[in-house]
Amino acid sequence: MAEIHAYLAGPDVFFPHARETGRQKIAYLKTLGIIGHYPLDNEVPAALLNDPAKASRFIGDANEKMMLDCCRDGRIGLILANMCPFHGPSMDVGTAFEVGFMSALSYRHNVIIIGYTPYRRSFEDRVAGAIHGGWDAITYENGVPRAPDGTMIEAFGGADNLMITSAIARTGGDIFATFEEAAQAGVEAGNRLRGQGTW
């Protein structure tokens, strides 16, 4: 039976107690039969710590390799993405990249993308809320909402940019309020893939 390997994406790595958060999430996944992988498991070599460019390259390469490892050798690759707004109305940009990376892998591998966020306001509502004056400052051109600078506000009612939500939907995932709900959905989605007789 194919193993489910989950990459834990999100801005959690920037939060206080980031390592403990990762340990707790991996322990929870283990109770569900999922093998978890957390970006902070990739230790930056001491020799690179004084060279920001080399250190950042090491981190980026290591995270990509970790995602690749989640779906190699017939594994079911799962990404559990914390989509909470980070430093703005949208999700963490690094997490968005990782969702895109796994989305690309899904065309060649068995990958499921699942998001979670306690913030239930739509993407466009959060964007408007970040603009001085909120919705009162928004104008409409042929039904399209525009910010005061004239740029269009994406308004599809999704939890974030359409490229994120469409990738989640295409791979059979969804967006949930909590990590625990997302993880449980990952098990169910993985079992559906197993039931398709791929292995």
Give names to the regions the model predicted:
Residues 1-199:
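Conserved catalytic or regulatory cores that recognize and/or transform ribose-phosphate-containing ligands
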